Amino acid sequence: MSAIKLEICTASVEDCVKAELGGAARVELNCALMLGGLTPSLGALRESRAAVRLSIIAMIRPRPAGFCYSRAEFTVMQRDAELALAEKADGIAFGILTAAGAVDVPRCRQMVKLAAGRQAVFHRAFDVVRDPLKALEQLIDLGVTRVMTSGQEASAYNGAAQIAEYIRRAADRIEILPAGGINRFTVADVIKRTGCDQVHASLSTASQDRSASGRPQVSFGGTVKQSEVEFTVTDAEAVRRLRGALAE
């Protein structure tokens, strides 16, 4: 399995460095992973590009929740994509759907055009489309580089049969990137059952910043109570262990 490419989901410069130290070949750079991953700052992208040599795919997602965007939101996505690519991102990850849950072909075409030959990745918005096989053909026709998917299940392990079908249907016309719940305990089975040549994983551990712990009654998340002490960071050792599992 040593030829399997490992992509790690990251949210900071430090995460990218740890992913590279652990043996990843590529990172998807986001912010706000607790919201499913949003567009990273230009500062984070620029400093990550300076810090690591591996491939960086910049997430282009302006807000949490669904993937049907207003005109203003889509304009922001276009500008963010242009800026990310100007900062030497190796590609962009995006997912744009219609209100009916289908691929928004015209808007996705514009995003692929903006990528201008660099990697254009359709992220896990694919996992909520109503007709995944039709969506796959549409993305192939658009010239999308890669589709990230859990097989429309809670994890790639659970969706392995569907992922295998996508790979069979794709027939090397587009890359299929299994994602969702992949770790060193599940990766071998996912690879065996899908026949994939790459995997995406989010391997994190808790870190703490106790500077806001003096007033526990204060929360910066509005009515949603969340920890103001803990946050997650990429676990370099977990990346290394997963990379080791791929070498077995």
Enumerate the language-model features and the residues they cover:
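Glycine-enriched alpha-helix->loop->beta-strand junction motifs that scaffold or abut catalytic
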Residues: 21-27, 52-55, 88-91, 114-118, ...
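Hydrophobic faces of well-ordered beta-strands that scaffold small-molecule active sites
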Residues: 4-10, 27-29, 56-60, 92-94, ...
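C-terminal alpha-helical cap/extension of soluble enzyme domains
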Residues: 171-248
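Ordered, amphipathic secondary-structure segments that act as subunit-interaction surfaces
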Residues: 81-95
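N-terminal pre-domain/capping segments
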Residues: 1-27, 32-39
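Catalytic cores of alpha/beta
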Residues: 11-21, 68-82, 127-142, 163-168, ...
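Active-site-adjacent beta->alpha loops and helix N-cap segments on the catalytic face
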Residues: 14, 33-54, 72-75, 96-116, ...
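Structural motif corresponding to the early beta-alpha repeats
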Residues: 46-85
